[in-house]
């Protein structure tokens, strides 16, 4: 069987720099570059009263999103890419370097399974 895309879900706990719009935006840009995806649009928004940040990159190949809860030290990340030339797992070292989590959980889902 073949899949149309791969979806990597990353749970980050005990993070640093997740209350900064600039840090989240830079992490998204670097993660997109690492996956070899094509950035089409990027939006980053602050959330009050906890200084959380949400950012989403629209990719030619799908999307990458980050949502943060600084009061909990937690960030939720989705990296969904389609196409043989992309590697969503390549975002993981970027996230680790940028946010320095104490704990990280990674789940992978194959999307759009096609029977050959």
Curated annotation (Swiss-Prot):
InterPro entries associated with the record: AdoMetDC_C (IPR042286), AdoMetDC_fam_prok (IPR003826), AdoMetDC_N (IPR042284), S-AdoMet_deCO2ase_core (IPR016067), S-AdoMet_deCOase_pro-enz (IPR017716)
Pathway(s) where this gene product acts: Amine and polyamine biosynthesis; S-adenosylmethioninamine biosynthesis; S-adenosylmethioninamine from S-adenosyl-L-methionine: step 1/1
MF GO annotations: adenosylmethionine decarboxylase activity
Cofactor note text: Binds 1 pyruvoyl group covalently per subunit.
EC number(s) per entry: 4.1.1.50
Residue(s) carrying Pyruvic acid (Ser): 62
Location of the active site: 62 (schiff-base intermediate with substrate), 67 (proton acceptor), 82 (proton donor)
Assembly behavior: Heterotetramer of two alpha and two beta chains arranged as a dimer of alpha/beta heterodimers.
Stated family: Belongs to the prokaryotic AdoMetDC family. Type 1 subfamily.
Annotated protein name in UniProt: S-adenosylmethionine decarboxylase proenzyme
Organism, scientific name: Thermomicrobium roseum (strain ATCC 27502 / DSM 5159 / P-2)
Lineage, opening ranks: Bacteria, Pseudomonadati, Thermomicrobiota, Thermomicrobia, Thermomicrobiales
């Amino acid at each position: 069987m073949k899949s149309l895309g791969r979806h990597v879900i990353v749970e980050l706990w005990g993070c640093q720099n997740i209350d900064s719009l600039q840090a989240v935006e830079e992490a998204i840009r670097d993660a997109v570059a690492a996956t070899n995806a094509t950035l089409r649009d990027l939006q980053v928004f602050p959330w009050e009263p906890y200084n959380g940040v949400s950012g989403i990159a629209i990719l030619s190949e799908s999307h990458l999103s980050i949502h943060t809860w600084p009061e909990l030290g937690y960030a939720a990340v989705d990296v969904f890419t389609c196409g043989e030339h992309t590697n969503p797992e390549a975002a993981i070292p970027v996230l680790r370097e940028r946010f320095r989590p104490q704990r990280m959980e990674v789940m992978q889902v194959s999307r759009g399974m096609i029977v050959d």
